[in-house]
Regions:
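Juxtamembrane intracellular "pre-TM" segments in multi-pass secondary transporters
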Residues: 1-6, 202-237
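Short hydrophobic/alpha-helical segments at membrane-entry points of transmembrane helices
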Residues: 8-9, 95-103, 235, 321-327
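Transmembrane alpha-helix termini and helix-breaking/packing motifs in multi-pass membrane transporters
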Residues: 29-33, 87-92, 148-183, 260-261, ...
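A single, central transmembrane helix in multi-pass transporters
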Residues: 164-169, 179-180, 218, 224-284
Length: 419
């Protein structure tokens, strides 16, 4: 049984996560399909990603220094007021690019402290022997909400028209909803999540010492830990690549691929997001029972290689069915990799430095996504069906990261348990 405090936090996370997921689908589609300015979104995404570098470094030290409950209260309170303001502005003046960009960027900044705090809290309130089970449940609940948000997003941004697959399922016509209404829904769920977090009471499994020193000094402690533990460093960076590419694919490449290469509507885009979550959910349920039978590093390497070939398939194929198949399979590989990766790091990184170590890895994530985001925002990739070349590049990068894991396998396996 999961700790009651963690169950309540997961419920709060699920409430706000549904509308966040809807919005993270709606905003990229707004730029690609409604404004026909996918390159604008590419630049916004790259710029926002770079800006989160400094925030994520600071966020990691906050996670290690302050009560994780207080952090979640702050996240949800600020989300309610900020997104509520944007929704109000949209209802008065109509949907505007700056409003869409602000909502998306704010959510990106929120994610950079929300998910590290969630994993740190889970580690803090869980016994060591329960790490794998807890991580599986984190993945299951997160992806369950992604399934729900993807399905709702398909209806909200694409509507339901006569003759469509969704019309056959639901039997009603629904017009697409304006973006400011989606943002308003997001604001309200932040408020509900804040109310749930208020009820959380917990006793940590591990005692944390009060942290001292500046943000830079505490960040250096995370760097120092990785320098002293080369196996953790190499594994953490190389295994992160699959998540970096997934974020780029979901937020920047997929809407352009569906709109320009497949020439399909918003339903296909949103359903791709939903079916990805179905695959991730299946992986979470499957690995919860079978995790002990897997060798973490070798399994991650195999899944990364498999995902590389899936990306290459997007370069070759021009099929709505393939992009749906691609989405469900990368859902499996991404979620499976995340469960194995987080569990491995829980076992090798002490809780007192987990936030700072994750901040260092996140800095690598952010710089990589900024570079790739700028490259893929070039006019070439956003013209006609050229976005498929971006998928080919992603496949090559994944293969290179897999080779890094293979070459350093002995060093990673020799890592002594620190936690």
């Amino acid at each position: 049984m999961l700790p009651k405090s963690l169950i309540r936090l997961l419920i709060a996370n699920a409430v706000s996560g549904v509308s966040q997921g809807i919005m993270m689908v709606a905003v990229p589609w707004y730029f690609s399909n409604h404004l026909k300015k996918s390159e604008w979104f590419g630049v916004i995404y790259a710029g926002a990603t770079l800006a989160t570098l400094f925030w994520s470094l600071y966020a990691g030290t906050l996670i290690d220094k302050h009560s994780r409950k207080k952090i979640f209260l702050w996240i949800n309170a600020s989300g309610f007021f900020f997104q509520g303001f944007l929704a109000l502005a949209g209802s008065i003046y109509g949907d505007m690019p700056w409003m869409a960009a602000s909502a998306f960027v704010y959510t990106m900044f929120t994610f950079n402290i929300h998910f590290p705090s969630l994993y740190a809290f889970a580690q803090e309130v869980s016994a060591k022997q329960d790490y794998a089970r807890v991580n599986s449940w984190l993945e299951i609940t997160h992806q369950s909400m992604s399934v729900v948000s993807g399905g709702i997003a398909a209806i909200l941004i694409g509507g339901i028209t006569r003759g469509s697959l969704l019309f056959e399922v639901f039997g009603v016509e629904i017009v697409p909803r304006p973006l400011h209404e989606i943002i308003a829904l997001d604001a309200l769920t932040y408020l509900l999540a804040w109310m749930i977090v208020q009820t959380i009471e917990y006793v940590p499994e591990q005692e944390r010492l009060a942290e001292k020193g500046s943000v830079l000094e505490r960040f250096k402690q995370g760097v120092r830990f990785l320098l002293e533990n080369p196996g953790v460093r190499t594994f953490g960076w190389a295994s992160y690549v699959i998540f970096i590419l997934l974020l780029i694919e979901v937020h920047q490449l997929l809407p352009v691929y569906v709109d320009r290469h497949l020439q399909s509507n918003g339903n296909v885009y949103a359903l791709s997001e939903m079916i990805y979550a179905v695959g991730a959910l299946a992986a979470g349920l499957w690995m919860r029972k079978t995790l002990k039978f897997f060798h973490p590093v070798k399994t991650i390497m195999v899944m990364m290689i498999f995902t590389a070939f899936l990306f290459a398939g997007c370069f070759v194929m021009k099929s709505e069915w393939y992009i749906l198949l691609f989405s469900v399979l990368i859902g499996v590989t991404n979620a499976g990799t995340r469960i194995l990766r987080v569990t491995w790091l829980f076992e090798h990184v002490p809780n007192r430095v987990i936030g700072r170590v994750n901040s260092v890895f996140n800095a690598f994530n952010i710089l990589s996504r900024t570079l790739l985001g700028l490259i893929f925002s070039l006019k070439f990739f956003n013209s006609g069906g050229n976005i498929r070349y971006a998928y080919l590049i992603c496949g090559v990068i994944l293969l290179i990261a897999s080779v890094v894991l293979l070459v350093n396998m002995k060093k990673i396996q020799a890592t002594t348990e620190k936690a």
